[in-house]
């Protein structure tokens, strides 16, 4: 059961402090189309958690209404090993876009799970295509993650800090939506992948931007 965000806000107003960061699937796909114009197919990488299943359902609904010409392949951690995933990405051409959501794999030892950020970096360095993501976790780090459409880490930190300060000051809880969301791109990866900076939207937040870039 998916409870609407506004219903939660109304029911728990003043009792909880929540920092809410939406996932911008529609805007992410539009950005991918803009930066990789030949894209006719999408590989959406996710795992078996409930939130991943919800993202796949949202993706199916959005592509049906807004991107009906786009063929979507759902690459799910339960259906293949990480090596199989990397091998699959090697066989896709430039017409295939790659969007990463999550790839949690259960460890062979106990019930622990391997952090998906490691897989994200491995995938970004192995894939022939630029790797787009849905949050600012691995952009501007030692990876080949290109970026995506979401709030920056600085924006998230700002809202979390405000929520903590209000709580420590004894103020009633509040619900905050992290803003603004915008295209976020690693300039070095952009150049390595052969994508023209001229294709970037005017409101793009650019990591590693050269001093002479306008």
Question: Where are these predicted regions, by residue range?
Answer:
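Short hydrophobic alpha-helices and adjacent helix-cap/hinge residues
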Residues: 1-214
